[in-house]
Curated annotation (Swiss-Prot):
Organism encoding this protein: Homo sapiens (Human)
EC numbers: 6.2.1.7, 6.2.1.3, 6.2.1.-
Stretches of the chain found on the membrane's Cytoplasmic side: 1-30, 77-690
Gene Ontology biological-process annotations: bile acid and bile salt transport; bile acid biosynthetic process; bile acid metabolic process; establishment of localization in cell; ketone body biosynthetic process; long-chain fatty acid import across plasma membrane; long-chain fatty acid import into cell; long-chain fatty acid metabolic process
Binding site for AMP: 292-303
Name listed for the protein in its UniProt record: Long-chain fatty acid transport protein 5
Notes on activation and inhibition: 3-alpha,7-alpha,12-alpha-trihydroxy-5-beta-cholestanate (THCA) inhibits the activation of cholate.
Family recorded in the similarity comment: Belongs to the ATP-dependent AMP-binding enzyme family.
């Protein structure tokens, strides 16, 4: 008899006792004694209680209750069910989630709605002189809640004057203002200013160039693009395409060096800083778009994932949910075009009233110095970041800091243990989720290596399935009836999250088919709909989930999602390459997978490592650049003419297995050089820098 059946029988037994008017506490006492003390001790105590019954008199329960207690002992297992010991933590976390959900829905149901902007304005009025943002590095400085609010109001009035009525700016489909920023504070002012007007904003990766950047701008549906002046070259490369689509472009400066591009600096300086009426946001609902964050996904070029006002508020509460308070100082080196840096970090501090320290980029030599200088108590991470910190030489002051909490995702168990052993008992708050996904997981009890914890109670609120999958097709396997096949405990399975009213999937801005590709139907029964995360997880008996792999055409390197389609598109522009197949391969001691490309040369052409190096450096960000090239005579394809990757991924760049010519990216030589056995050994040992 399974545990579920045993629990059902026990529940019926308790209901029967309650119906007969008998106490049920003897059953609970008997089970507790058995689980805590074991069978022998429990039997001795119950036997003594029966022998002492004549002297205990009225305190002894009725015979029916005693009989029920004895029956309960035979029904349930001798040991406590594995997940039951986490029941108090599960209940507390579920209560917090429900409370936050009801509070957020209530705020957005008001008229005008109470959005994240309203929460920020309340903080600015309550503590105008408190430092909100502190930035490090060249030009270090800070801005208070009051100062940022005033500058955001100036941005709102300047944009309203420059672009017209916000109602027309956001008419029809949600129209975003795009921010292509390399400097945090001016971009944040523009974002908050547009939010005060009720308009969503799209944040674009400033490292993009050429076709991927143009695609990102055009796919947003935005009519306005605001650019930092130091990204002039990137803008001018795509400006003709933007002008053909009547997209207005502005620099965040007082002058414009580019014909056809305006400058907002003077208008921002001249704009008033008085409050923006909340009535301008009256049309917002909990379903309204608040942000567009670009994600590589698994189906091609970057797509603008829609973050609704409800979703933004939920994500911004993660710091509060982890136990952070207004007294904390949060440190982040994560980019603002990512959810973790912008929503969890910046908005989380806006919500809490805490101070956020922004570093321009990650530096192992500056990380702990910054933390000590600014009294940092909370750090945000991706798994790769903490591994880099563990790899630097040990210092006497490694534990001389005030950091008590680290929040992020993608932390491996070995790095988790090493990090805490070296830098002290810092509590790890590991979370899991995707920008466009409809469900997240939180490791709220701190189990090392787990990306999240799922109780039976929480699963009723956020249903999901782990199912068998076809690695090559990157899709679920179905049984004879056409339904997906669940995996057992401890077995790797593709994570599918159910789309229900309290867990909707909003998807991407653009054609509906972009979002439909992420949905799987008829998973457990006819008519149900699930979101395909593309991630392979395994769940143990206690409800902890562990990451196993990532399916599809995306892999993760240096904390960034890399779209193989995007990289293939860039490489295909090289004249001596006829066909390109990009994939990620594992490197010993490194998080994620590094990019590798199997290529077929065009007829009569030879491989030019220097030319390829110059091309990828010009058109791809560093994290998306393939580090290994494999030259094949012919590409393997499936019956539907899809390029096959499984064998290529398995063989990787192992010179002892691969017979095809292999090349490695050499930054010193500024070329792709033939990969030798010595170079391969250096990569595996970590002495060759990737």
């Amino acid at each position: 008899m399974g545990v579920r059946q045993q629990l059902a029988l026990l529940l019926l037994l308790l209901l029967l006792l309650w119906g007969l008017g008998q106490p049920v506490w003897p059953v609970a006492v008997a089970l507790t004694l058995r689980w805590l003390l074991g069978d022998p001790t429990c039997c001795v105590l119950l036997g003594l209680a029966m022998l002492a019954r004549p002297w205990l008199g009225p305190w002894v329960p009725h015979g029916l209750s005693l009989a029920a207690a004895a029956l309960a002992l035979t029904l349930l297992p001798a040991r406590l069910p594995p997940g039951l010991r986490w029941l108090p933590a599960d209940v507390i976390f579920l209560a917090k989630i429900l409370h936050l959900g009801l509070k957020i829905r209530g705020c957005l149901s008001r008229q005008p709605p109470d959005t994240f902007v309203d929460a920020f304005e309340r903080r600015a009025r309550a503590q105008p002189g408190r430092a909100l943002l502190v930035w490090t590095g060249p030009g270090a400085g800070s801005v208070t809640f009051g100062e940022l609010d005033a500058r955001a109001c100036q941005a709102a009035w300047a944009l309203k004057a420059e672009l017209g009525d916000p109602a027309s700016l956001c008419a029809g489909e949600p129209t975003a203002l795009l921010v292509l920023a390399s400097q945090a504070v001016p971009a944040l002012c523009m974002w908050l200013g547009l939010a005060k007007l009720g308009c969503p904003t799209a944040w674009i990766n400033p490292h993009g160039r050429g076709m991927p950047l143009a695609h990102s701008v055009l796919s947003s549906g935005a009519r306005v693009l605001v650019v930092d002046p130091d990204l002039r070259e990137s803008l001018e490369e795509i400006l003709p395409k933007l002008q053909a689509e009547n997209i207005r472009c502005f620099y965040l400066s007082h002058t414009s060096p580019t014909p056809g591009v305006g400058a907002l600096g003077a208008a921002l300086d001249a704009a008033p800083s008085h409050p923006v009426p909340a009535d301008l946001r009256a049309g917002i609902t909990w379903r309204s778009p608040a942000l567009f964050i670009y994600t590589s996904g698994t189906t091609g070029l970057p797509k603008p994932a829609i973050l609704t006002h409800e979703r933004v508020l939920q994500m911004s509460k993660m710091l509060s949910l982890s136990g952070a308070t207004a007294d904390d100082v949060v440190y982040t080196v994560l980019p603002l075009y990512h959810v973790m840096g912008l929503v969890v970090g910046i908005l989380g501090c806006l919500d809490l009233g805490a101070t956020c320290v922004l570093a321009p980029k990650f530096s192992t030599s500056c990380f702990w110095d910054d933390c000590r200088q600014h009294g940092v108590t909370v750090i945000l991470y991706v798994g790769e970041l903490l591994r880099y910190l563990c790899n630097i030489p040990q210092q006497p002051e490694d534990r001389t800091h005030t950091v008590r909490l680290a929040m992020g995702n993608g932390l491996r168990a070995d790095v988790w243990e090493t990090f805490q052993q070296r830098f002290g008992p810092i509590r790890i708050w590991e979370v899991y989720g995707s920008t466009e996904g409809n469900m997240g997981l939180v490791n709220y009890v701190g189990r090392c290596g787990a990306l999240g914890k799922m109780s039976c109670l929480l699963r009723m609120l956020s249903p999901f399935e782990l199912v068998q999958f076809d690695m090559e097709a990157a899709e679920p396997v179905r049984d004879n009836q056409g339904f997906c096949i669940p995996v057992g405990l401890g077995e790797p399975g593709l994570l599918l999250t159910k789309v229900v009213s309290q867990q909707p999937f909003v998807g991407y801005r653009g054609p509906r088919e972009l979002s439909e590709r992420k949905l799987v139907r008829n998973v457990r029964q006819s008519g149900d709909v699930y979101y395909n995360t593309g991630d392979v997880l395994a769940m143990d008996r206690e409800g902890f989930l562990y990451f196993r792999d990532r399916l599809g055409d995306t892999f993760r390197w240096k904390g960034e999602n890399v779209s193989t389609h995007e990289v293939e598109g860039v490489l295909s522009q090289v004249d001596f390459l006829q066909q390109v197949n990009v994939y990620g391969v594992c490197v010993p001691g490194c998080e994620g997978k590094v990019g590798m490309a199997a290529v077929q040369l065009a007829p009569g052409q030879t491989f030019d490592g220097e030319k390829l190096y110059q091309h990828v450096r010009a058109w791809l960000p560093a994290y998306a650049t393939p580090h290994f090239i494999r030259i094949q005579d012919a590409m393997e394809v499936t019956s539907t003419f899809k390029l096959m990757k499984t064998r290529l991924v398995r063989e990787g760049f192992n010179v002892g297995i691969v017979v095809d010519p292999l090349f490695v990216l050499d930054n010193r030589a500024q070329s792709f050089r033939p990969l030798t056995a010595e170079m391969y050994q250096a990569v595996c040992e970590g002495t060759w820098r990737l």
